[in-house]
């Protein structure tokens, strides 16, 4: 059954920013459950390539990171590359991360992102730009996008394509599996948050609810029982591009391929970013997006893939 577009979030505040020579607006948004998150909007710049006609892209990061993963203060990054190619980019930072408020009155987990925040942003973008939406995520960010579509909280029919970097739940991840999964739970109780910065895992600490959901998702995805995590993935028929790093030990490429194969799309591509497949290096979990070599060969691959599908939709 098709779902209706979610209502846009309430915009609590907004302000203008620049990233190098790119201008942007950052909004603090509030979902219907009261949770707040940051949304950075990079509109089509006047000098951009017009062939993709401002096709919208919604990007979100994985654990412990924010918009800096996609665009630097100097205007460098995959998000900036997409803007220069003529795409209209929105970057969502989950509750409690990046520019989002640290103090939340509502739960700040991954579940809330797929239930409330991602659908609300889809509704906001659709009001402003009627073109089909591309969604993009790294690590857990890609999993969240796919899960929100599979559960029909985001509207599937309005999606031009899904791009996932190192996104998977089923291979390794010992820290999120019993018995080791007790450690993040204990650390959250001790600090009141997961101390990612102290552990040098990323620039932002995670809310306890997000770690709780991460543990539950991994357990559910690996379960051989009757759990519903994968329900709805066979209904995902939009184009999908899944990229796995040849030396990614955080989210190994076999798991990335497994997630991509859960989609029923006829337009489904898995790329192994490795020397064996013609790339300049074997990419790791971060380097597949944030590295000079990725800028040379991965960003153009992704932008070209999206550009072809934007033209097909227009």
Please report, for each region that a protein language model flagged, where it lies by residue.
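Acidic beta-to-alpha connecting loop that harbors the catalytic carboxylate
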Residues: 246-248, 286
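Catalytic active-site module of serine/aspartate enzymes centered on a nucleophile-bearing elbow/loop
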Residues: 273-314
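Alpha/beta-hydrolase-fold enzymes
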Residues: 127, 131, 136, 140-225
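Short alpha-helix in the alpha/beta-hydrolase fold that links the catalytic acid
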Residues: 238, 252-262
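Alpha/beta-hydrolase active-site loop
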Residues: 107-127
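Short, surface-exposed "cap/lid" segments of acyl-processing enzymes
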Residues: 44-99
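Short beta-strand/loop motif that positions the catalytic acidic residue
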Residues: 236, 242-244
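N-terminal cap/lid segment of alpha/beta-hydrolase-fold proteins
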Residues: 8-50
């Amino acid at each position: 059954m098709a779902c209706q577009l979610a209502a846009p979030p309430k915009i609590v505040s907004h302000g203008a920013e620049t990233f190098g020579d790119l201008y942007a607006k950052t909004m603090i948004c509030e979902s219907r459950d009261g949770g707040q998150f940051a949304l950075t909007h990079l509109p089509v710049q006047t000098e951009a390539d017009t062939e993709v006609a401002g096709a919208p892209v919604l990007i979100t990061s994985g654990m412990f990171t924010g918009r800096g993963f996609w665009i630097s203060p100097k205007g460098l990054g995959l998000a900036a590359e997409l803007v220069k190619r003529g795409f209209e980019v929105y970057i969502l930072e989950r509750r409690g991360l990046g520019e989002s408020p640290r103090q939340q009155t509502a739960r700040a987990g991954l579940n809330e992102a797929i239930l409330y925040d991602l659908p609300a942003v889809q509704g906001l973008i659709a009001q402003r730009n009627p073109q089909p939406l591309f969604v993009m995520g790294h690590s857990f960010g890609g999993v969240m996008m796919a899960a929100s579509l599979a559960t029909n909280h985001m509207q599937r029919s309005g999606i031009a394509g899904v791009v996932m970097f190192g996104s998977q739940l089923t291979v390794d991840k010992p820290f999120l599996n019993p018995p080791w999964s007790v450690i993040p739970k204990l650390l959250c109780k001790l600090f009141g948050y997961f101390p990612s910065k102290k552990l040098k895992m990323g620039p932002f600490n995670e809310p306890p609810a997000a770690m709780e959901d991460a543990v539950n998702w991994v357990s559910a995805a690996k379960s051989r029982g009757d759990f519903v995590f994968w329900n709805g993935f066979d209904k995902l028929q939009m184009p999908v591009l899944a990229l796995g790093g040849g030396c990614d030990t955080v989210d190994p490429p076999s798991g990335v391929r497994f997630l991509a194969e859960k989609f029923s799309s006829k337009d489904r591509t898995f790329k192994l970013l490795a020397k064996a497949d013609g790339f300049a290096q074997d990419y790791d979990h971060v380097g597949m997006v944030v590295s000079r070599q990725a800028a040379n060969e991965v960003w153009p691959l992704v932008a070209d893939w999206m550009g072809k599908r934007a033209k097909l939709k227009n």
